[in-house]
Amino acid sequence: MSSPRHYLQFSDFTAAEYDHVFQRTRWIKEKFKQYEPYHPLFDRTLVMIFEKASTRTRLSFEAGMQQLGGSAIYLNTRDSQLGRGEPVEDAAQVISRMSDLVMIRTFEQDIIERFAAYSRVPVINGLTNEYHPCQILADIYTFIEHRGSIKGKTVAWVGDSNNMCNTWLQAAEVLDFKVRVSTPPGYEVEPTDAGLRGTAHFAQFSDPLEACRGADLVTTDVWTSMGFEAENEARMKAFADWCVDAEMMSVAAPDALFMHCLPAHRGEEVTAEVIDGPQSVVWDEAENRLHVQKALMEYLVLGRVGDEESN
């Protein structure tokens, strides 16, 4: 039995593979909009394991698998043996014998890496403290829909150097664009934590306005991610000057887009004027989680299909 292909961080795929996935996303989304059934994963089963709560991740994967003709089973660690001390490695061997695909949303990247090492089927990272590849997959596809190729473009990341930031930095290496990161002192990017090969595709700025200057895309996330609630008060003070506002958008490129993975806190990491304004594409971004993940699941289970249809 050959080893399954996993999607645990953005750097797991090549630029050519992303080109294929984005082409399939476009084709699959068109089918969806035209109410044309497409069931390449008929009778296949996706198991979704949640340790972290979610709205968009669960909805997009569960609906996506059903739309592809398969079924999705929801597990959380409170209601399964995973929450009662069963070794991750044992759970992986059992769950992967009863399913065709596994998506895990958890805290530590180590958990998903260990699960994948013992899984007989593909494993997808639905989010960890370190990486959020499915979200950046949707973000980049959304940029492509609105502005074309992201190659050679500039992305400004304003806020916490969290899992989203890490994944944007990996994406820049794979797809050849630049990321300008601005964080408060003490929250800077650590290239090794982000899993980077080098520093050629990103730069750090102490001034968020300078990070946004000329950027083609400005993006951010909440200041306090799940699992860091104890730091919330300190973070509110530290990040006060890192709220994406109209001034930051005004120094970006004239056609710059704004993105946020949601849920958002208006008045904290972004003003209502920006997130609800004409440059914001957050609703397209959220919807595209559904379509890119359908293309991702198709690719992981079936390999390259439909190249002629996608072109």
Curated annotation (Swiss-Prot):
One GO cellular component term noted in the UniProt record for this chain: cytoplasm
Keyword Transferase among UniProt keywords: yes
Annotated residues for binding of carbamoyl phosphate: 54-57, 81, 105, 132-135, 261-262, 289
Pfam families named among the record's database cross-references: OTCace, OTCace_N
Cited InterPro entries: Asp/Orn_carbamoyltranf_P-bd, Asp/Orn_carbamoylTrfase, Asp/Orn_carbamoylTrfase_sf, Asp_carbamoyltransf_Asp/Orn-bd, Orn/put_carbamltrans, OTCase_ArgI
Principal location: cytoplasm
EC number: 2.1.3.3
A single GO BP: citrulline biosynthetic process
UniProt GO molecular function: amino acid binding; ornithine carbamoyltransferase activity
Keywords in alphabetical order: Arginine metabolism, Cytoplasm, Transferase
Tree of life domain: Bacteria
Catalysed reactions, as listed in the record: carbamoyl phosphate + L-ornithine = L-citrulline + phosphate + H(+)
Keyword Nucleus carried by entry: no
Cell compartment(s), UniProt: Cytoplasm
Pathway named in the protein's UniProt entry: Amino-acid degradation; L-arginine degradation via ADI pathway; carbamoyl phosphate from L-arginine: step 2/2
Enzyme class: transferase
Binding of L-ornithine, residues: 163, 221, 225-226
Family, as annotated: Belongs to the aspartate/ornithine carbamoyltransferase superfamily. OTCase family.
Function noted in UniProt: Reversibly catalyzes the transfer of the carbamoyl group from carbamoyl phosphate (CP) to the N(epsilon) atom of ornithine (ORN) to produce L-citrulline.
PANTHER family (alphabetical): ORNITHINE CARBAMOYLTRANSFERASE, MITOCHONDRIAL, ORNITHINE TRANSCARBAMYLASE, MITOCHONDRIAL
Name of the protein this chain belongs to: Ornithine carbamoyltransferase
Gene: arcB
